[in-house]
Amino acid sequence: MDGRTLGLWLLPPVVGGIIGYFTNDLAIRMLFRPYRPVVIGGWQLPFTPGLIPANQGRLARRIADAILGSLLTPDALHDLARRLLELPRLEAAIAWLVSLLLERLREVRDPRSIEVAADVLRDLAGSALPRWLRAIVRQRQGLDAQIDRWFEQQLLSQKLGPLQAQQLGDWLLEGAFPPDQIRRVMLDFLTDDNIRNLDRIVRDRTRGTDWVIANLFGVQSSLQRLRQFLREQPEAGDAVIAELSQRLALRQQLSQALQTFQLTDLPQTTLTDLRLQLRQGLRQWLDQDGLSLLEGALGGLDWTAAARALLDRLRTAVISDEAIAAFRHEVALILDQRLEHELEDLVAAALPILALEDLIIGRVEATPAADLEAAIQGIVRSELQAIVNIGGVLGVLLGCVQSLINVWSLST
């Protein structure tokens, strides 16, 4: 076999393998090179700059559309935000904020910082507390549950102390039911019909010696004389009632009865009615007068003194790790519950602010063509090396076919 025949056999596979192997690299270079327009004699050569540098703006927009349309979709961003805002991460962020806040508060001593803290407290109390009060009034079930819990845990188990029972007993005997009021009640009760009914009851229900006295004398005349005495001599009647109250030790007996009294002694129906009336009364008071009372109370506060006292307290207070952990856990739970319902809306509102499309377009347009080429070449060499190898193999195969064609042509 001479050299010419050997060349016909070997040269096409070698050349085809070289071309197939380096085609990808050559194609990528042809897409990017030259990076700038080539101008000769005032005339720009065709296909300069390369295809990608000449259309880098349109390429950037297509890349942005592809990324936002298939990769960074709203659902994908929602899932990403949900993973980023998991409960442990929220707790860690809140713990960091609390520690930072405590460190800063311990350093705050100048009057300007105190004024700023006072303004914050004033704004917070002036806006947040009224909204919180209105929200409580609107949430009927939540407010009723709180009132019922307070009623059952606090009010039902309360007892009056000796001093409180004495003061309440004095008020009942002197303010609510003084001797003059008792005398008027007795006069209203001792009507002719009531006197006759009392006399008949006494006659019917007495036995033994009392029956003889009741049926011979009765109580009608005695009650009529008592009524006449109370009506004609009011001052003397009041004195008799006061003396009788003192002799019977009503004040001491009433005080002892009040000390042992609890609301649980009342019938269940009465307690139910009392609970309903308490709910309605508190809700009506909060709705009508609570807001004005709160605003009036807040308006009279010295916010500067309150801020100074709060900062001094925070500066000198020793806050345990357990309290901080409980606080951050509760706040994280509240945020997690709110995010569970509002995260989708927050992500939708954040997308226009982030302007991801403009960001991607700007980054692609600002990247030099040489850097884009190097990045694509690196991807091809590291991730798509199999394609390069297949190109070389295909080149060798096509070269072998060409060698067979050449040899067949010579033989014919």
UniProtKB/Swiss-Prot annotation:
The chain crosses the membrane at residues 8-28, 390-410. This is UPF0754 membrane protein syc0451_d. PANTHER family: UPF0754 MEMBRANE PROTEIN YHEB (PTHR35791:SF1). It is a multi-pass membrane protein. The lineage of its organism: Bacteria, Bacillati, Cyanobacteriota, Cyanophyceae, Synechococcales. The keyword Metal-binding does not apply. It holds the Pfam family DUF445. It comes from the Bacteria.
